[in-house]
Amino acid sequence: MNTLVIQSFRNQNIPPWIQRCLDSVRVWCEVQGYQRCFVGDEIFDLVPDWYMDKTGKGPVATDFARLVLIRETLNNQGFDQAIWLDADVYVLDPNMTLDCPGSCAFGQEVWVQQAKAGTGKLEARKNVHNAVCLFRRGCVVLPFLMETVLSIIRRANPDKIAPQMVGPKLLSALHSLHDFDLLPQVGAISPDVARDIIAGGGPALALLQKESVIPVQALNLCASLISSEMNNAEADQLIAGLPLLICH
């Protein structure tokens, strides 16, 4: 299937660990025979001015812009399939395949966190995420999703727009009604899991492995987490330890 993989990040001052993620996707595309497109900050030119005035440059604007890029890829560039991968997704296994029986699919994460402050107990929640999005030509979900995102932001109070409002939170709500095809091989790591990976193991990592439907082959490293809690050396340690996730 003629496939384009789309990614976006700023063109300058790319953190070394983000570059490693981008390189892992490039290798994966070469192995799979996919074409790849990288878009810089010009991605925000695809978002209506009124939308940008409300959200600014950030994940909420990117959530809509990625849908515009995917629509353009399928409608006007001759591709049968478009796959979006966030810039902070690291592909562990270049032989990973993304497939689904329907016309679209989204990622599924097992998010491990403290069950209640002070208890020391962990819980794992399965969530839908859009760090990976797969759409095929003729998909009816794509235009519906675009219109839904615009409608939500148009009516939203600018002071109460949450980062995941039209991304994971919207998809999780729609999934309960639509039952999307999911791609659990592209997961995500929480702060607790990240700390265990750097340490070489721990209860959060063990719980993630236990609750994963299939071994993860790619991971959203959550740039906001790394930027706020880790320096570049720790980010390198995290990436070096990721193979722990497929050794169970």
PLM regions: where:
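GT-A fold catalytic core of metal-dependent nucleotide-sugar glycosyltransferases
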Residues: 59-114
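Alpha-helical context
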Residues: 4-5, 49-50, 67, 121, ...
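N-terminal anchoring/stem segment of glycosyltransferases
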Residues: 1-62, 77, 136-140, 156-159, ...
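Glycogenin-like
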Residues: 8-10, 17, 91-197
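Short, Lys/Arg-enriched charge-dense amphipathic segments
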Residues: 57-69, 104-112, 180-191, 203-218
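A structural signal for short, well-ordered beta-strand segments and their strand-loop junctions
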Residues: 36-39, 81-86, 105-107, 182-187
